[in-house]
Amino acid sequence: MSDVVSAEKIACEVDHAARQLAQAGRLDLTREFIQHGDVTVYTHVTSVARASLSFAERLGRVGVSVDRASLLRGALLHDYFLYDWHNPDPSHRLHGFRHPFFALARAEEDFELTPRERNIIVRHMFPLVPVPPTCREAW
């Protein structure tokens, strides 16, 4: 498969999964929050999902397999904290350290998660949060 076809396939796969999560939960709220600069959380997580699937395809070519469904959902939900962390609200202090736990709590409110998806979400800030991932999809 050419890289162009693969990139288009991945983009469609990410868009489909994002639509499913938006219908079943609150993923569309992430369009309202800025992640970094002028990039929304939604744009950030869909970009991470595309990059993750692209990397997974390359790994697959050399015999390294991943749980693609968990990788995709985990990537889309890794920043599912659902608040504007730029707001000076005291509960947003130490956002970099705490948001994986908030993201996991919000995702568990809206979705049934696999243990691997939980690990992807809560461990994605390693080494800032010093507990390493326990599955390859979370790296």
Predicted features along the sequence, with ranges:
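Metal-dependent phosphohydrolase cores
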Residues: M1-W139
